Amino acid sequence: MATHAALAVSRIPVTQRLQSKSAIHSFPAQCSSKRLEVAEFSGLRMSSIGGEASFFDAVAAQIIPKAVTTSTPVRGETVAKLKVAINGFGRIGRNFLRCWHGRKDSPLEVVVLNDSGGVKNASHLLKYDSMLGTFKAEVKIVDNETISVDGKLIKVVSNRDPLKLPWAELGIDIVIEGTGVFVDGPGAGKHIQAGASKVIITAPAKGADIPTYVMGVNEQDYGHDVANIISNASCTTNCLAPFAKVLDEEFGIVKGTMTTTHSYTGDQRLLDASHRDLRRARAAALNIVPTSTGAAKAVSLVLPQLKGKLNGIALRVPTPNVSVVDLVINVEKKGLTAEDVNEAFRKAANGPMKGILDVCDAPLVSVDFRCSDVSTTIDSSLTMVMGDDMVKVVAWYDNEWGYSQRVVDLAHLVASKWPGAEAVGSGDPLEDFCKTNPADEECKVYD
């Protein structure tokens, strides 16, 4: 088995957010076709409502907690699950649902999705996926407005105007905004106007008024009252920011450039056709397409000390999934070796960034990183040091599955901070880690 296989350890304490059900990856087709078995989906209750009940009755039955025999609540017990809507059931929307469905005892309940294709497209594309394989969950069309996933009813609506979506009627707590369209305050704010409480944008946000969070980097800054609209950044920022944080803390980043060799996405053209970016207008499966990316600059949104120090470009290539970041930086610390750099990553991977960052020592290729749960995997054999202050680091990431795991993590973080949720942890990942690992070198600050 590949040595980079990541332990899918949560960034959220287990009383609020449990681990992915599998600790170790299987390669290469592990996502939902081999990794997620139906018997493991025990975290979701089957509906006990009869066939004549309305969709709303069925949803209520699934989210209202079962009666308990004691008047004393169990510490850390989730009293009621937060109701989630997915707006846009494309690559990230469907990956998010699969990732969420594989989590046991999630504090979330997906009750509705908005997709222009209706129930037929939503059910078929969820069940059969060219990258993930066949979903082992039972996916059925219940009626022309409802699908079921292992008996769990999910309403399907089709409306391109967020203001007309039934979020108030359904009591939606969190909207996963996955269209890539409503990424600014006015756009994403339409979900709030429609009755939702919170919005998580699965893309870089436009506007300084929307805070960005990258799990493993700055999630400790989130609080329920900080903002109603937040961003999970981009897949590339989720790859770059964790290891940039390690490099900056250990060696001090002076400046650097990044290139992401990125799989093609739906924003490109299958055949040559008009596009606002003339390079993305060219056939995605036939070309290496240089294009822009804001991922390097966006790192400063979660690591403010790096503002103005990083920049980069993207090369879109003819692969459907998995991407790789190549970062070259100048550092303050002199006299480093490649092993010094890799050791810093191993320390982070086994400590406060466990489940977010991993290190791979095997000579692998992109397909081996499909469905990697972590945000970033350092390819240790490609780490280089030139002169006394130049460092090159290469890191792999699954730009769909790994990113969607972080969206679930961020949604779980939002749930853990919800009014009435049991307070757990200090909010500082390093401090929480050091409570159980006091002998670790990084924990001396807490002595």
Curated annotation (Swiss-Prot):
Coiled coil: none
Site (Activates thiol group during catalysis): H262
InterPro entries the UniProt entry points to: GlycerAld/Erythrose_P_DH (IPR020831), GlycerAld_3-P_DH_AS (IPR020830), GlycerAld_3-P_DH_cat (IPR020829), GlycerAld_3-P_DH_NAD(P)-bd (IPR020828), Glyceraldehyde-3-P_DH_1 (IPR006424), NAD(P)-bd_dom_sf (IPR036291)
NCBIfam families: GAPDH-I
Organism: Arabidopsis thaliana
The protein, known as: Glyceraldehyde-3-phosphate dehydrogenase GAPB, chloroplastic
Pathway, per record: Carbohydrate biosynthesis; Calvin cycle
Residues engaged in binding D-glyceraldehyde 3-phosphate: S234, C235, T236, T265, R280, T293, G294, R316
SUPFAM superfamilies for the chain: Glyceraldehyde-3-phosphate dehydrogenase-like, C-terminal domain, NAD(P)-binding Rossmann-fold domains
